[in-house]
Amino acid sequence: MNTEKPLFFDTSDGQNLRINTISTYLKRHFGRKIVKLSIDGGFTCPNRDGSRGTGGCAFCSSAGSGEMAAGTGEIYLDLESQINLIRGKWPQAGYIAYFQSHTNTYAPVEFLRKKFEAALRHPDVIGIAIATRPDCLPDDVLDYLAELNSRTFMWVELGLQTIHPATQQTMNLCYTTEDYDMAAERLMSRGIRVVTHLILGLPGETEKDMMASVSHVCSRHVFGMKLHMFNLVKGSPLAVTCSDYVSFETMDEYIDLVIKAIEIIPPDITLHRISGDAPRPILIAPEWSYMKRTLLNSIHKTMKDRNTWQGRLT
């Protein structure tokens, strides 16, 4: 058990943060507020076009988990329109262009270059985040990402979701834990930051299963992790096959489990998300999950009440 509170516990603005949030990390790294802007780069997915599978992952809507992403096809203009909306609130902020929808390395390198370089041409963009599948990182793409990483702040977000083969098959992921391990190793060997996405509460998984997935990712020594509850959304295959499934019946049930996960995550791993925020019009369950601010406040309050923090059990 780690009884020494980590460095992020006390912050200069008087907050007592108990997790190493990416927003806190970025503010310390750049010395100012950094905002992540979701972008739809016009990519597709090998799990939709037949090269890996069809129908997509069972939990994905037709937007490929990018319901919040802006996507007119003009990357620079999409960024500019989002920045204009929030510039008044944070006039000194910098921005990270987050390519979120579908699989953002599933294309020839020249297509990737066109999209990513367009984002980096914006004078207020200080970095880039790229979400992808672990089985879509061929050598030429990795070489380009390494070159990109050498001249901007960057991370690659790998969707793992779970390490358990039975769930991977049920969710129609069409990739394996071994694919993830190899992708993470190949990225990190090139000096590229890796952020791993996990879903808590997938159908059929126990608390022990979920903690095993978290522990596995921690053993990879990644830069960051994303955790959130399984959200059943309209337009996903599971909305048809598991229409009555609820991952966590109550907010308190999720809070208890996610805190257990946070306690075993080393404090040097940045947490990019600890909740899900599916748009309310497409959210089926759990109904309480749209109350993101209430949930986050409750997680932090509960951690304070329990006098616990990220990495306490490492």
Where is each model-derived feature located?
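N-terminal [4Fe-4S]-dependent radical SAM core
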Residues: 1-96
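Alpha-helix N-cap and loop-to-helix initiation/capping positions
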Residues: 74, 107, 111, 171-179, ...
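Auxiliary Fe-S-binding modules of radical SAM enzymes
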Residues: 2-24, 33-35, 224, 232-314
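Hydrophobic faces of well-ordered beta-strands that scaffold small-molecule active sites
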Residues: 35-39, 95-97, 128-130, 154-158, ...
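Acidic (Asp/Glu)-rich catalytic clusters
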Residues: 86-90, 116-123, 143-153, 185-189
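Conserved C-terminal portion of the radical SAM core fold
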Residues: 178-237, 252-275
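Core AdoMet radical
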Residues: 63-82, 86-109, 124-137, 153-180, ...
